[in-house]
Amino acid sequence: MSSYFLNSTFPVTLPGGQESFLGQIPLYSSGYTDPLRHYPGAAYGGSSVQEKAYPSSFYQQANGAYSRATAAGPCDYATASFYREKDPACALASIEEHSFVLSQDHRKTDCTGSTGKSIYPEADEQKPSAPVYPWMQRMNSCNGTFGNAGRRGRQTYTRYQTLELEKEFHFNRYLTRRRRIEIAHALCLTERQIKIWFQNRRMKWKKENKLINCSQTSGEEEEEKRTE
C-alpha cells in the first residue's frame, strides 16, 4: 500500500526529463489542503481520487478553530467567570453549573419547612437529658420522702433540740427577738424555725389547757349533781 506522505529524501527531479512537481506540493502542509487542490486526480492506493473534493476553506476554518481552542486553554468554571467573556462552550458550561447550584439551593430550602424544622426526624432529635438521681431531689416534702419542690417540707428536730426548746417554753412562752437569736445559734437553727416552733407549741398548750378545763368543769358539775 502506497503512503500518502512524502519522504524528504525523495529526488526532486525524475528520470526521463520530466518536470519536477514537488515544488508545487509543500512537504509539511497542515490539513493536507494543497495536494487535493493542485492535483484532484492523484492516485491513492491504486485508485483515482473521486471528483468530489473538499474545498480548501473548510480545512482552513478547521485549523483556525483548533488553534484558537488550544490558545484559549482549558475552560474556567469558576463562579466569577460567569460574568466574563469566554468561548461559547465555556460560557455554556458555566451557565449550566450556575443554574445547577441554584436548583440545589432551592431544593434544600424546600426540604426545610416554613417553621425551620427538617422533614427528617433524625436531625431534629435532641440529646437525652441528664438522669435525675434520688439524692438530687428535695427531701422532707409533704408528698413523701421525695416530692415536689414547690411546697416546703416539714422541719424535723432532733431529740436534743426538742428537749432544749421544751425547757425554754416551760419558763417563757413568748420569746424576745434577742433571746430567739441566742437559741437559734445554740441549737444550729434559724430564727424563723424557732419562731414557728413556739407558735405551734403555744397552740398545742392552749388545746391541752382547754381540754383540762372542760374536764374539770364537767367533773365539778357531776359532783354537784350527786350531792344534790
Swiss-Prot record:
One of its GO terms (molecular function) is DNA-binding transcription factor activity, RNA polymerase II-specific. A motif (Antp-type hexapeptide) lies at residues 132-137. The keyword DNA-binding applies. Keywords: Developmental protein, DNA-binding, Homeobox, Nucleus, Transcription, Transcription regulation. It is found in: Nucleus. Gene3D superfamilies: Homeodomain-like. Residues 150-209 bind DNA. Its main location: nucleus. One of its GO terms (cellular component) is nucleus. Pfam families: Homeodomain. PROSITE patterns: ANTENNAPEDIA (PS00032), HOMEOBOX_1 (PS00027), HOMEOBOX_2 (PS50071). GO terms for biological process: anterior/posterior pattern specification; regulation of transcription by RNA polymerase II. The keyword Metal-binding does not apply. Sequence-specific transcription factor which is part of a developmental regulatory system that provides cells with specific positional identities on the anterior-posterior axis. Belongs to the Antp homeobox family. This is Homeobox protein Hox-B6a.
